[in-house]
Amino acid sequence: MAGELVSFGIKKLWDLLSQECEQFQGVEDQVTGLKRDLNLLSSFLKDADAKKHTTAVVRNVVEEIKEIVYDAEDIIETYLLKEKLWKTSGIKMRIRRHACIISDRRRNALDVGGIRTRISDVIRDMQSFGVQQAIVDGGYMQPQGDRQREMRQTFSKDYESDFVGLEVNVKKLVGYLVDEENVQVVSITGMGGLGKTTLARQVFNHEDVKHQFDRLAWVCVSQEFTRKNVWQMILQNLTSREKKDEILQMEEAELHDKLFQLLETSKSLIVFDDIWKDEDWDLIKPIFPPNKGWKVLLTSQNESVAVRGDIKYLNFKPECLAIEDSWTLFQRIAFPKKDASESKVDEEMEDMGKQMLKHCGGLPLAIKVLGGLLAAKYTMHDWERLSVNIGSDIVGRTSSNNSSIYHVLSMSFEELPSYLKHCFLYLAHFPEDHKINVEKLSYCWAAEGISTAEDYHNGETIQDVGQSYLEELVRRNMIIWERDATASRFGTCHLHDMMREVCLFKAKEENFLQIAVKSVGVTSSSTGNSQSPCRSRRLVYQCPTTLHVERDINNPKLRSLVVLWHDLWVENWKLLGTSFTRLKLLRVLDLFYVDFEGMKLPFGIGNLIHLRYLSLQDAKVSHLPSSLGNLMLLIYLNLDVDTEFIFVPDVFMRMHELRYLKLPLHMHKKTRLSLRNLVKLETLVYFSTWHSSSKDLCGMTRLMTLAIRLTRVTSTETLSASISGLRNLEYLYIVGTHSKKMREEGIVLDFIHLKHLLLDLYMPRQQHFPSRLTFVKLSECGLEEDPMPILEKLLHLKGVILLKGSYCGRRMVCSGGGFPQLKKLEIVGLNKWEEWLVEEGSMPLLETLSILDCEELKEIPDGLRFIYSLELVMLGTRWKKKFSVGGEDYYKVQHIPSVEFIGGYLK
């Protein structure tokens, strides 16, 4: 795997050399030679990765190659950036720079020559020490694919004694196969170790299934399978054993015809255990005739397997075991001799066992591993010792042990393409149960070069590509994600505890990053010891109190420095010694919640010319230097600092690559910013018409998210004209003046892709809303006409929030058939609203309703009785008596699981 990750780095370096070839005047020969050397390195690495080598010699060589590639990329990119800075500088700087050109090119030639020498040395070492032979032979007596397949077959046979908590799932699956004529392919999907094979085997051996089907076949699909081999196994299963030799002699065409005819004339069930890729199923399925008596049950970690082209398809996702079932399974393994006649488990030992079970998250295979670890441990001392180190013990089990969860879960990782391996390893940055912001994650991946220019097709954005990567990891059941019902994109994601242990283990194995927790010098055991020099080029601090950059960070080759902070109720952490003179190669710098020394971002920040990602979210800083303008490679810049009226210098003219810009919410009145060159922006937050011209927005045609503060110097008519060409907008937030002196026509919102809309400004006659909206929030709009007749016709709308001053009328009507997709409705602070009519058939999918601080509203509508989807209603305390049990209006809400009041709960 290490070789594959390094190959990915070599490809990035090759692309850089190829794309910028015209910039290497005076060093062409050295660069051409470097490209040849990279090709040679790639050939070694391909052989290494193909054999999945594990020898220490090869690992050391690969690690050295990785360092060479990093150093080469730093040298080449530094040279190119200095050339670019010189060409975009003023006259005086260009004259001064001209005298240094020859010297710089000579130095660059020497640096590239040094890299080539190191490459030659490492290749010579590989040959002289026999490393190449070690790579070719691999040192394995048995291919890994065969070992994995044997493991799965062994596991699939050992299911009965550990069958716990799956009875309901078996019943459902048997029903799909036996009773449901409209279902022909059933897939059981979920993360490794969930018990998919155990479940499939129970279904396969069920009496109802045996009675329903004439023929049964079980095929364990290896990752390196051939179609011919799979078809042979199916035919052998479906026919007599005597024909085995005859079947082995058949070619693919004959196998296809035999199977097609057999499946056309019989009722057969075929189980495919552990299909990994969509393409695998596509290769297998031509043997199945359409609409006949056959059925297929398959297991996979990939949800998308078998979806394409199969109309009669059903995906079944079993849940992890509940705590009671987890404990039952654990007891069977950890205390195999215990039965009803024997004494109960020691109470203290039971408490400790249940605490350790939390690490398993209900994952059956993880529970088995834990039980196996503890089965031979009889004393409390043994259990306490394992309890402390349970994470590392689980992950550190050898892959030769068939009961090892690490082996099963790591298969998911090993199967990933190289770019997704990087994406997954990057998640090791985040602490346990941390909700990872998916938008920020996408930009971090891009800043690290994990997603590159070639990934962006047909106008795709960084967020599009990041989401596609994330969706692939979700399909492979390697991460868990959450998003609001009204959102069209991912909100946050996180790792299951067990998968996070795998992630940390792999990150340590690859020296991917180093983690320091709470204070300098205390480091997570999963990534090494921070008291020794930081070897990794990525460093993350979790909840530091103080960090001295020059003293505490000892790796001048660091590429990523990220600070994560959880407790925002304490004082900001202190950052000292921030000249950044030793960290000039940083690509990612996230200083969340920092308190700068003297509250000034140092001028030296401008020396970090490699920076792609800079975040000062919630930082205590009162001064931003003009040297920020040197950061021409920035794609992500967050200046949403925790300081009012900060002066922001006009530094954006050369930031042509910027995709995300979040400005301070409150800037000094003298701040004037020219943003017209930021034509690649995808997200712009806190744009103010006081500090910038609305005309700057005209060229930002890639914008998907725009948040504007509209001041009196710009009319709504001018703003509408400036944003009319932003055809890709999905999220639009406009906060403006509430003065009634402003024009009252409203905003022209002709955006066909707009999904989220927030309007906080006076526009009493707004009559039009985009048809694809999924969420709308209105405040201080002063609408004179009931907004419901317009909003309820928006077929995709899932969330509506009406806040204080959004509507000034007295009556609202929700018509039957209106709001067909609405799930959330919140109405707060409408002080003139008196009457609300909800007709039967309105809001049929509504789940959450909030009516607060609407003091003139005379009654809650009778129509709530007909909304059976409601799960939660929130009301002010003045309604409590009427809607309590026995109250005169209780009948309106008696079908709703939860009705909450300010200061109390009804149910």
From Swiss-Prot:
UniProt key word Nucleotide-binding: yes
Source superkingdom: Eukaryota
Keywords associated with the record: ATP-binding, Leucine-rich repeat, Nucleotide-binding, Plant defense, Repeat
Keyword ATP-binding belongs to the record: yes
UniProt cross-references to CDD domains, sorted A to Z: RX-CC_like (cd14798)
An MF annotation (GO) of this entry: ATP binding
LRR repeat boundaries on the chain: 608-631, 843-868
Record-listed ATP binding positions: 190-197
Entries under InterPro entries matching the protein: Apaf_helical (IPR042197), Disease_R_plants (IPR044974), LRR_dom_sf (IPR032675), LRR_R13L4/SHOC2-like (IPR055414), NB-ARC (IPR002182), P-loop_NTPase (IPR027417), RX-like_CC (IPR038005), Rx_N (IPR041118)
Ranges for domain NB-ARC: 144-456
GO biological process assignments: defense response; response to other organism
Pfam families the UniProt entry points to: LRR_14 (PF23598), NB-ARC (PF00931), Rx_N (PF18052), WH_DRP (PF23559)
Homology family: Belongs to the disease resistance NB-LRR family.
Purpose of the protein: Possible disease resistance protein.
Domain notes: The LRR repeats probably act as specificity determinant of pathogen recognition.
Name of this protein: Probable disease resistance protein At1g58390
Organism this protein belongs to: Arabidopsis thaliana
